């Protein structure tokens, strides 16, 4: 019990002050991690707040960032040698983006209540068309998050629907994983999440 309390204390007070590179050094995994991942600190200008929940890499090299606050930003200027990012607001007013994929000029955004296709129809760099791809599940509590995937080879997306209460929900399909086909058909595929 005493060592558990010490661990919680250390995690609470010291981990937030560390950097990702230092954690790898501390664990002795930094050299191995560098074979797979490059960690680059990206400065975010004040007063911009980005509580990132999902990312997608665009064909032109920009990064799309979906946020818990419901914004979708496009970020350019990310270079590991000298990052000088530029953040552009593409869409706002969404609900806790925890899934983001990009295909054929459209963003597929997983929100708590639906999977939405978002496009820029007039080419001004801002979203102007929002289409519901699937809303085949319920939503009853602000803690009932939905987590989306990238596309599989057949063009399907998957959504994991969290529960706000243990083992039951009043909302349809909470605690399930859903498969959404390219045609928008929603298929429950696994329960007990």
Regions inferred by a protein language model and the residue ranges of each:
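Beta-propeller blade termini and top-face loops
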Residues: 21-193
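Bacterial N-terminal signal peptides
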Residues: 6-16
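N-terminal secretory signal peptides that target proteins for export/translocation
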Residues: 1-4
């Amino acid at each position: 019990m005493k060592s558990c309390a010490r661990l919680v204390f250390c995690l609470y007070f010291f981990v937030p002050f560390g950097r990702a590179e230092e954690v790898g050094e501390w664990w002795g995994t930094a050299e191995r991690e560098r074979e797979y991942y490059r960690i680059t600190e990206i400065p975010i200008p004040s007063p911009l707040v980005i509580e990132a929940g999902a990312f997608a890499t665009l064909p032109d090299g920009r990064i799309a960032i979906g946020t818990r606050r419901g914004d979708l930003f496009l970020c350019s200027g990310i270079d590991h040698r000298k990052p000088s990012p530029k953040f552009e607001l593409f869409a706002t007013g969404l609900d806790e983006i925890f899934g983001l994929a990009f295909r054929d000029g459209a963003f597929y955004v997983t929100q708590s209540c639906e999977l939405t296709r978002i496009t820029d129809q007039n080419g001004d760099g801002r979203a102007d068309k929002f289409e519901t791809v699937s809303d085949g599940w319920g939503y009853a509590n602000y803690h009932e998050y939905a987590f989306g995937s990238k596309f599989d080879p057949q063009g399907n997306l998957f959504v994991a629907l969290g529960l706000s209460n243990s083992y039951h929900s009043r909302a349809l399909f909470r605690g399930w994983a859903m498969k959404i086909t390219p045609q928008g058909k929603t298929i429950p595929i696994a329960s007990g999440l």
